[in-house]
Swiss-Prot record:
Gene designation per UniProt: PDCD4
InterPro entries for the chain: ARM-type_fold, Initiation_fac_eIF4g_MI, PDCD4
Function: Inhibits translation initiation and cap-dependent translation. May excert its function by hindering the interaction between EIF4A and EIF4G. Inhibits the helicase activity of EIF4A. Binds RNA. Does not seem to be involved in apoptosis.
Protein name according to UniProt: Programmed cell death protein 4
PANTHER family hit by this protein: PROGRAMMED CELL DEATH 4 (PTHR12626), PROGRAMMED CELL DEATH PROTEIN 4 (PTHR12626:SF3)
Superkingdom in the source lineage: Eukaryota
Entry similarity comment: Belongs to the PDCD4 family.
Coiled-coil blocks: none
Induction: Up-regulated by viral v-myb.
Positions of the UniProt region annotated as Disordered: 21-43, 57-124
Location relative to the cell: Nucleus; Cytoplasm
Origin species: Gallus gallus
Subunit structure: Interacts with EIF4A.
Keyword Glycosyltransferase set for record: no
Amino acid sequence: MEIEKQHVYISTVEVENLSDALFSGDEENGGSEERKTEINGNWIPATSITEAKINAKAKRRLRKNSSRDSGRGDSVSENGETQKAGLVVPTSPKGKVLDRRSRSGKGRGLPKKGGAGGKGVWGTPGQVYDVEEVDIKDPNYDDDQENCVYETVVLPLDERAFEKTLTPIIQEYFEHGDTNEVSEMLKDLNLGEMKYSVPVLAVSLALEGKASHREMTSKLISDLCGTVVSKTDVEKSFDKLLKDLPDLVLDSPRAPQLVGQFIARAVGDGILSSTYIDGYKGTVDSIQARAALDRATVLLSVTKGGKRIDNVWGSGGGQQSVKHLVKEIDMLLKEYLLSGDLLEAERCLQELEVPHFHHELVYEAIVMVLESTGEKTFKMMLDLLKSLSRSSVITMDQMKRGYERVYCEIPDINLDVPHSYSVLERFVEECFQAGIISKPLRDLCPSRGRKRFVSEGDGGRLKPESY
């Protein structure tokens, strides 16, 4: 037993010495013999015991090193070989960090590459579900939920929000002139009891605008009647306008006459009753309201049978024909020659609302100067062009275009007016001195070559101009 215990409890040092002796003996003897050890009556080769000890020691080291320390220091493989820190042993826990497979059988909850399934995914893309049927026996069933129709409720506009919302709409209408667009925008609003205020606001803005704006306002009220507002609303709106005339006069002195024209146009369009004016007889205390009703009465009495009044505001802007504009400008210049009022001539030109056609006035004014025989027309037209140029009513581009038209047609004008070249040169020079035209435009003025006389060669003496 003592012998067996001695064989069993062999220290590590003895095993190593034994291994060294064994291998050294093999080398000396050429490996002819193999030493054996008896354990529990069994003879086991010494090499097997040595390998078992080394493997056990290596496994203990691996178990001792945790996964957090596996990346530091050296490790020993199962074969007893030392591994460097940069190399990862296949059995090391760090090898599982680089493994892309799930560490548990349930996965990480990500959708599959094929499409359907996964956390937060409701089937394949494009999958159609059946309509969920309502269970009447469900404890949470509510019969009031069936056949429900949901719609957006728009609150009615108050007075402040009404003016803030509709003012940009009407001002934009003055630019594009599309009544259908205004009608669609007003239908989207819940006007409530403020419908009658639509014509009131439109007329109030038109009083401060141009004649074309007032014409567009009359057309807008006529088109909105029956779709957005009713005839009762139109009557109510004009009642309010007549009542507010004392305040409107402060901003627009011509408000009574203009409101009277709006009333006459509304009666002519058929959106206001013909007896509307008669209802105010003897009941009007305001001077402004009485003046407005008198103006409407006069306009309606001129027409036959209350026909539609189309020209109550005149035709302004691009609605006018070229022939009509030429006639208006000719009358404007003739009235100016009679009155000499520069401000009135400027106002009449602006009321035409044709800034793109102002070159016609420049052309007609110069032609009148060429056709005139006295200095009065010359001086008055020079003052007119100077005033219009300084006030920027006529732009430099329109002024230049008017002069260029005269330059092109001066040969034809000279057939009727023999001295037109000399008069034109003088007028152009005066305009340049007054700052009306530029130097390049003055230099473009054509000049007719002097006629050569037969006797011009006699001593080089020239004939006088009056010859």
